[in-house]
Amino acid sequence: MKKHLSLLVLILLIGFNYTQACTNFLVTKGASVDGSTMITYAADAHVLYGELYYTPAMDYPSNAMVDVIEWDTKKLLGTIKQVSHTYSVVGNMNEHQVSIGETTYGGRPELSNFHSGIVDYGSLMWLALQRAKTAREAIKVIAGLFDEYGYYSSGESFSISDKNEVWIMELIGKGEGQKGALWVALLVPDGYVCAHANQARITTFNYQEKNDWFNESQTVFHAPDVVSFARAKGWYSVKDKDFSFSDVYAPVSFGGARFCEMRVWSFFKDVNSKMGKYADYASGVIKHGKNEFAKNRMPLWIKPDKKVSAQDLMKYMRDHLEGTDWDMSKDIGAGPWELPYRWRPLTWEVDSVVYCNERATATQQTGFSFVSQSRNWLPDPIGGIHWFSVDDANTTVYTPMYCGITKVPESYAVGNGDLLTFSWDAAFWVFNFVSNWTYSRYSYMIKDVRVKQQAFEKKYAELTPVIDNAAKTLYAQNPELAIEFITNYSVNTANNLVDDWRELGEFLLTKYIDGNIKKEKEGMFERTATGYPAGPDQPGYPDWWLKKVVETSNGKFEVKGAAH
């Protein structure tokens, strides 16, 4: 009984959603190297298949309805009114360069509404992308949808960007039987970066008398009852100006800090040298102050020491806490080959003491991830690039998908395989083949993966201005030709990448099979003068690992006579 109680208490203290754990980084125009706005999103779930969603622009009759299918389960939740025109959406970016990502934080369990609500968090994202030309309009659409039809999910953080602005929006339901949601949306100040990773991060904010949606000077929107609802529940009783959304509706716990805010901190400390002072907080040390709110939290947004590029964000999405006290490659759990991953569960118990593994940004169970880049100096179909990838961000390649494309590559298309159906033609399975083989001898194989990964992403970065300029010239003459051009480029680039990555997998299997390492010379495996394979390298285990084996084996491996 004691064991069961301790695990129950742990779950309550952690307050962490194990099924859907994601990471978002947000970059404003003034914080990016070229004036882009950018957001990232890693969709991490153990049952999520990585594929590139696409819906074309459509016109509908006045009486049209649309089914709402829950993203997580594919369950039909209900039907809602369709609008007269929807915009095309590739992945999580629409034709007007609006992009949306999310992370689930859960929050107070009594505020979930899984019976009377119709619209889940996934549907909110894609319905908003189909209906909004700007980030502000997307927030308005989201709020209107859950007010009219009810919110079906638990607490969510959204990243919402367009070619000029970046917003963070956090919401949570009102509990069973109540429509609407409690929410706040804040404009990230220009020149700053923000992040969220499964822990609500909005604390205090400037209360507004009304949501004046198209007033460009208004930088805060929120539910009118976001404070009064908490008062009525007895969860908050002091001044409105001190009200903290997160501390009331989703208080940070050990798990919220260690498994979630740790990822935010790791990004922040990589872009700002002053963020080291929040290491204790990120490790799970929560200090409480006024109103019992956490007083040692990180700021919601920070100014980076230097401006950030899309390629920088790709690197930050590959983080395993390297160089910190929580570096996942440096303890015994990494094994002899410094593997920066730990298989689930996140927590485990020995002699009635509960321990945890780290939860880094890069993780094995990523279905897909992206870096969305919106550029206001180009026509919309060309200005938006959805840098898309499947599987673990650490071992994948971000390939460019211009937001104006009219089809997606077959290797990434919906229906090409699924999580239970292997396909050599599917990007998800090809990248998983490489990553999962790499995990088996990580410190060696990751070097080969990095060479290819960096070569592809460097080439794509160098080609981008060339493709941009060619597409822009075509667009001035004939927009349809420009869209055909960027579609062909995006599709062919991605399909060719998958073919090349499949070859990388074959190379890695050949080179590292059976624990050996084949010798190479001038890009070819070595053979003897007679054409026979050269003897492989067998570097053995590192000394520190061998010492651990000796320490824990009670002398049973000691050689006490001739070894052969």
Give the positions of each predicted feature.
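Bacterial N-terminal signal peptides that target proteins for export
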Residues: 1-6
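Histidine-centered catalytic/metal-binding microenvironments
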Residues: 452-564
